[in-house]
Design a protein with these regions (language model features):
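Switch/communication elements of ASCE P-loop NTPase nucleotide-binding domains
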Residues: 1-92
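Acidic, Mg2+-coordinating catalytic modules of nucleic-acid enzymes
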Residues: 90-104, 108-243
Length: 243
C-alpha cells in the first residue's frame, strides 16, 4: 500500500449501518498497512471521536467554505482513557461533528426529558444533537473538543447543591460548575444550570436522595402525565437551550 491514496466520496451511500461499520473497520486496518484514505462522509459511523486528529470539517459560511482541523492533544493522562471509554460506551456521540448546534448534558434523564419537553413546547430542532456525556466530570472534555472544531454548543448541567449533600460534596460540585463555566467559549457556547438538577426542576421542589432511583423512567413518566404543568422557570430554560 506504500504511496497509495484512496479517495472515497460518501462510502455510506449504498451501505446499511452494519456494512458501514464493517467498511470503516476495514479502512482503519488498511491505514496500518500504509494506505492513506481520504473519505468524505455524512455518516457518524465513519467517524470515531477518539481519532479527532484525523478529522477535517468543511463548513459553508455564506459564500465561503471554512475548514477546521485540530492536530494537537486535547486531553492528557487519565482523560484520554476516560474519553475513549465514553465513545466506546456510546459511539452515537460522533454525530456531534455534523450538528448545527450541540447540546451537552450529563446523563440519560436530561437527554430523554429535554427532547420530550422541547417537542411539547414546539422548539425542538432536528439539526441539533443532544450528547449525553456520561457525567458532569466528562463535560469539560467535550467542551474542549467542540471549541477546537468551532462547533456551536450549549452546556446543560446540574448545580448539585442539594440540601442532603455534605460540605465536601458541595465544594466538589461548585468546583466542577466553575470549571465548566470557564471553559465555555463566549464565541461558540453558553451554559444553562439546573437547580439543583432536572428532577427538582420537573417537580418544582427539593428532592430526597432516596427518590433518585430509575431517574429516566420516573422523570419521563411525570412529564407525560395528563395534567402535568411545566414550571415556568424550566420552560424558559428549555427555550434558551434550543434557541
Amino acid at each position: 500500500w506504500n504511496n497509495t491514496i484512496l479517495l472515497w466520496e460518501e462510502p455510506e451511500f449504498y451501505l446499511n449501518p452494519q456494512q458501514e461499520r464493517a467498511c470503516y473497520e476495514a479502512l482503519s486496518e488498511s491505514t496500518k498497512l500504509g494506505l492513506m484514505s481520504v473519505v468524505s462522509t455524512n455518516s457518524s459511523r465513519f467517524i470515531e471521536i477518539e481519532n479527532y486528529q484525523s478529522l477535517c470539517i468543511f463548513r459553508r459560511v455564506k459564500e465561503e467554505i471554512e475548514i477546521y482541523q485540530y492536530s494537537g492533544n486535547l486531553f492528557s493522562g487519565d482523560e484520554v482513557t476516560v474519553f475513549n471509554m465514553n465513545y466506546w460506551i456510546n459511539p452515537d456521540r460522533s454525530e456531534l461533528f455534523f450538528a448545527k448546534k450541540v447540546i451537552l448534558v450529563e446523563g440519560q434523564t436530561d437527554k430523554i426529558v429535554l427532547s420530550y419537553l422541547a417537542k411539547y413546547l414546539g422548539v425542538f430542532k432536528y439539526q441539533y444533537s443532544i450528547i449525553e456525556c456520561g457525567s458532569k466530570s466528562s463535560i469539560p472534555q467535550f467542551i474542549r473538543l467542540l471549541n477546537a472544531f468551532h462547533i456551536p454548543y450549549v452546556v446543560v448541567y446540574d448545580k448539585d447543591n442539594h440540601y442532603w449533600r455534605n460540605e465536601t460534596e458541595l465544594m466538589n460540585s461548585t468546583l466542577k460548575n466553575k470549571t465548566i463555566q470557564k471553559l465555555v467559549s463566549k464565541n461558540l457556547g453558553t451554559w444553562v444550570e439546573f437547580e439543583n438538577d432536572i428532577e427538582e426542576e420537573i417537580y418544582n421542589e427539593s428532592r430526597d436522595k432516596k427518590n433518585y432511583k430509575n431517574k429516566p423512567f420516573y422523570a419521563l413518566e411525570t412529564v407525560i402525565k395528563s395534567g402535568y404543568v411545566l414550571p415556568e422557570k424550566l420552560k424558559e430554560k428549555i427555550i434558551k437551550i434550543f434557541e
